[in-house]
Amino acid sequence: MSPPRDRVVEGCNLVGSTAKDRNPLCSTLPVLPDDILVEILLMLPVRALLQFKCVCKSWRTLISSPQFAMDNFRQRSSADRDLTSRLVYYNRLYYHCRVGFLPLQPLFNSPSATTKVVSFDMGCRIGALVVRGSCNGLVCLHHLQSCCLRLWNPCTGSASQWFRIEFNCFTYYGFGYDHVHDKYKLVTVEGQDLTVICTFGANSSTIGPKFPSPAVGLSGSIGKFVSGTGTLNWMAKLTGSAANERKWVILSFDLANETFGQVPLPRLSGGGDNTCDPELQVLRNCLCFTIDHNNTVFDVWMMKDYGVTESWMMISRVKLWRHKYNNPLTPFSISEHDVLLLMLPDRRLVLHKSDSGLLYFPLIDSSSDAHHFPICSKTNFRIFFLYHDSLVLPPQ
């Protein structure tokens, strides 16, 4: 007979428990103080913590608390973000409402072994469901036909209530966390200048500041969220600048103050040889961008200290063969050994070793997403975001 659910782990100190809750046969074993036990639990991965909720009522209460969930996420992320990182994607073939997850740790550690994609049928038979971003382990979902938003935690299965928004077609948008007010926000830009801020929990939509007029074009519609700064960021070309003049700035939006600003780019030498627009991304929670030279050499720059021009440094140079595509090189993640996961201009995923310059094509099994091209051959119609496992609860 299997043991009772509150006695799966015996001989341990249960947070908030009394002597009667512990096994008397194991009373001679050393007992950990509650604060040390909590510190140990904070270091555990999400899957283990979900299992440990069955140990006893006090553990379930602790692990289910919002503060523990956020503390666990921050501690695990700061220790090694690769352990909890995945790429989450949706496909732009709207009649296939599936969301897929590609784990990054096995991809970096064993590129010659097959890494499997886990995909979910989101059950939308009418209308399209798209992903608008991911932050703190929460995925922002947007149902286009009903004009509704919700936040979803794939690890726990919990989700917020749908709430309706007034605008459905975005020119630009970005999803992030306002750590000052403890709010998750989706910022959308309608047309050329109307900014709408959708706040989860309050389930409200408000008109924000006018979109800055100096920026007449953005490189990419999706704003990049930098955790800790509370900002969304877009690459923007200034008014009147020619395509070959490199007059680009990073346009930022402060989620707490709800104001626009600018972040300086590094001082780049040369010019006139760029085929595609710069591509803005976030690596190691730092702003990064790639810029090309004749579409065959791509430099990857990282801003170590947000907002400080002198902190920009080139972290990698990727050399490619000549090709017919005018798409940028897109970095998704970087391992502790400085291996970059990139999407090539032809939409294939590749691993790049910065020290040797070698490229490796990882083996990926995306058969669970059978409606699409296999990811290992081409990522067509897929929009990717970086996702981290967490126990964080969506606001209600």
Where do the model's predicted regions map?
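N-terminal entry/capping and adjacent linker segments that precede and initiate structured domains
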Residues: M1-Q396
